[in-house]
Amino acid sequence: MDRKLRIGLIVVVVLALAYPAASWVIGMSVQHQLLEREGQATERLPYLAVVKRDYRRGVYSSTEEVTFGVSASVLKSLQAAGQDWGQQAQFTVRNHIHHGPLPQLRAFAPATIDTEFVLPPEAQQKLLAMIGDQAHLSIHTEMKWAGGSTTLVHSTPVKKDTPGQGGFDWRGLDVKSELGRAVGTQATEGTAPGLIVTSSQGNVSIEDLKVSTDVHQAFDELTIGKGRFSLGHLAIDAPTPVFKLDSRNLTLQVDSSVTGDFVNSGGALSMDSLEVPQFAATQLVWEVRMDHLHGPSLASLTKELRDAQAAQVRAALQSGPNDAAALAQQQLQTTQKIVTAFQTYGLQILAHDPIIEMPHIGFKTPDGDLMLSLKLEAPGLTPADVSGDPKALVAVLPQHLQATVNARIDSALLEKLLGQILPDSDKSNPVKARLQQAQDQGYIKVDGKALTTQVTFMGGQLKINGLPFAPLMAPPPPPPQAPPGKKPAPRKRKD
């Protein structure tokens, strides 16, 4: 036999014998990674708890079934939304795992995973009755040799019409998620063309939904990075009670970063247009920033809040959803833990000069514009100020608190809003009188067709437009009116 041929045969035999062993070892590593990631997920999602896990490992493939329990608060939200199958407090995730190094001879990877959701029987029946068997959801994950994974989620479009009841048109979903080697590192892109639901109770239309994230972990507990959510069009039309909503290009953006021991974060919610009964506006925006947040304290606060909520979920699953007394006791204990966490770590954040700012809040209407801004900080507070008696903190805080509020509103818009909020002139006239009194005192300024004011609190003093604030006295009552046909009595002259 040719020497090269013999060597080739030997290599093939060695590989054939070694492949099962390699696949078995890789399967053990994959199992460890999955358990670790599931533990991290439940830590970051305190509204879920693992009820049961079954992992059946083979040489070339494995199957994992994980049953999660849902918190009582989530169930109440489902019930409020009319989903009576929300009584089911559990759902199961089933993973079909194919070990590498050549899983199913379709990839060169440690493993590939195909995931499916197993709903409770009642929920499954309702879902089938709603959408039939047309829908198909695929979740495919390919793990990486250097750590991390790539997950692709695809949902097929589904359209169903029920005569006399309505229908829906789901246009599909595509998501790609990249998990990095480092814990908490993730980048996600997702798109959903839209959903249209019609029924006798109303119609809902959602178009052009997009989601993206690029985040990593900081201080072991915090998620830092960028995120964006956008919705091209949202329309709601309900006949009873009559309600209509139409919004265009809704966008939510968040961004956070770390500098030393401090976290800087911000977010902006904006809409090109919004129309609801008695109100229509364009260029709506609400920006929020929270800067110089002490990272270690914020991480500890986040962990305590998650642990409190997770403990409540575990206790609720043990006692059952129908034990009202136990659920009430669990809620009380959770509330006490949350209060304690804020008293401890929230005050530590306050002692490191945080800054809260809303630099831009506003919108435009045919009647005029509204613009607001706000900034809060309390520089100079020390850990000693916040670690003692809360009454002492209340006493010292006004000396450090610095607050500024700027407001500008067009007069015509203010007039319209007052008319909608206080349609009764007996109630609106006193408000208008107080506004005029504030204008006369310099607390409100006229800038063209708009009214402006600036409110500041510094050094324990409240000022409006730079003037020390004195509580506005109630305007004098109007003179009494004589009955029709009768002249008012003449006033007596004083000699």
What kind of feature is each model-predicted range?
Residues R6-I10, V14-D495:
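Glycine-rich, small/hydroxylated-residue low-complexity segments
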Residues M1-L5:
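N-terminal positive-inside, membrane-proximal cytosolic segments immediately preceding the first
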